[in-house]
């Protein structure tokens, strides 16, 4: 997958220098999601080995870690008013986009403020989604540890889980995630459209640093 990532980012560099469109962003997003799915499927044999080797004590430790992680999430993202959460999201978005584009101009900041105020999902939704995913994963772990299925059967269950990750959500949950994804991509397209030549060079350089990282990883394999 690493050479494919590098090639895709190289193509995105050229798109940025011309005019990055919403359709191109959708294509890039779909490519990344499909690549993650393929990489996850390739890891299934290793994951099955790991899960079958776990002890009950290790599973209990995993549950405690998840409980602590969830408590940290609640403290960091849910222990504030809706307005404070919006401000927090704005600061996080600003940090991310400054990293990619360089310093944003006044018009881009205005676009971000409008998009942030109208964000289609909140932190509570992502927390609920997080809990659902954790329970699905723990159910697989319990199945492996308690029933000790044969390797092929566990691999099949893991493959079903991975393939269903983006396909088996409820209609309501998937609709919210789709709206959030579209909202994010539209914001990126708008920021790129209003980007200066310097910002485009910054974005190309940022993508090049990732390409270089991928190239190093490929050479080390």
Regions found by a protein language model. Give the residues of each.
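Extended amphipathic alpha-helical interaction segments
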Residues: 40-170
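Short, flexible domain-boundary/linker segments around small modular repeats
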Residues: 13-33, 96, 154-175
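A cross-kingdom marker for long, charged
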Residues: 127-221
